[in-house]
């Protein structure tokens, strides 16, 4: 298997929402900058919005709502465990982002008075702003490429290259050929998404996940190995979605008057989407399956919902519902809890960053689902993609070139070759992934307790040994799957270790410990922070105080 060497000023890992916006912003600021993107899929149709999007979940529209109110609302949704400065910056920049998207041709509906269509999503304020853009991903990818960014498709990130404690580039793997792709760069932006393939979805399909199945925690693991801190990893989120399809629709249907009902026809949620814990409680109490009722709505509202669902984010829904014989005017939509995931966009897990998208490693920035800006959604990916680019461009201007650590590359090359050697290996990589994710569901996610979390530690050691010595890679694609499963195992260990130390229950089903069922603000009103210890297998856990709008520590 070959090696390929590249040079860049800035390398971005991940060509999704955050990655594309980072590339665009960097080249707006410095058009002659050499920007390279590593993308596991194809930049045109990859990431969590492979097609289009129906809304910006967070826009603080001037004279209508405020960034301060958004911070208050999202803090409530995070049970207080939220650093305000980053969320404030995101909300403050959100309206300018909307206007920028409009200038690119993105359509945001307005009423007869020229006001944007806003919907109730958060506990306070109407920040969710309707958008109808079925070609959003191809649009931002095209703009990034037109400005001069170079997309290296089919390459997953493996490690951050280091030079005297500073990020100095990225080494990745071509997911088809197994080629090692090494790019030296003066700054690195991680935008590689969360961990979608964490537990198994209820359908049983390995890749039938709610979020982009290419997201296997690559960015989390790269940051961790480079010495960066992560937080919120104990927040293992799942939601109730369309049964068997695992596609999102709550923010589209419920905010427009749809009703989430239990089997006794009690209304669980209506006209807002911030009460997800009530859905979890109803299902846990045996009042499921839950369903969304739309038949009571006016015909024009149902038509609007159909138009959005069938044309924008996941158009395959039209074929799915037709195949199931579901007509929203007559039939309800059945919901079911799906797989757990780790994610900074919908959840709280990610690389520790400040309001400047800076990690704890010089020259390394993070944006989007890989970054711990809780519940930032698409707005956060776009805003912090830009913020990361702005800081990276400034860092590049103020710092000298970096050296390529040939020793680090040789170690990676030797391991790649060892994993690709088929002799003595017979375990199918799909089989071990299934078992890994099944046991994550058994031991790592809620309901949690000390025994289960420690049992995962024992299994993780066994899985690491099997991945190193027994899993067969018949081609470059299967080789990339070995690395993906290894990343899933590492993410599960980070999650379990963090959950073990948070000896309380918080965030509903996202972190419920049967041995510590109560919330304990006195001891655990703080961030759990994990970082690499003496070796990658040794996870060090510390706590970090919650930071308020004034930059000072917040007490419960």
Residue ranges and their predicted role:
Residues 1-9, 22-25, 42-47, 100, ...:
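Glycine- and aromatic-enriched mobile tails/lids
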Residues 10-37:
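N-terminal Rossmann-like FAD-binding beta1-loop-alpha1 element of flavoenzymes
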Residues 14, 185-187, 191-192, 367-368, ...:
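Short, well-ordered coil/turn residues at beta-beta hairpins
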Residues 41-72, 250-252:
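Conserved N-terminal glycine-rich FAD pyrophosphate-binding loop of Rossmann-like flavoproteins
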Residues 43, 61-107, 225-232:
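Conserved FAD-binding subdomain of flavin-dependent enzymes
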Residues 45, 97, 102-187, 191-201, ...:
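Conserved redox-cofactor binding core of oxidoreductases
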Residues 190-247, 378-391:
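Glycine-rich loop(s) and the adjacent beta-strand/alpha-helix scaffold that form part
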Residues 222, 228-342, 391, 395:
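An anion/pyrophosphate-binding glycine-rich loop and adjacent beta-alpha core
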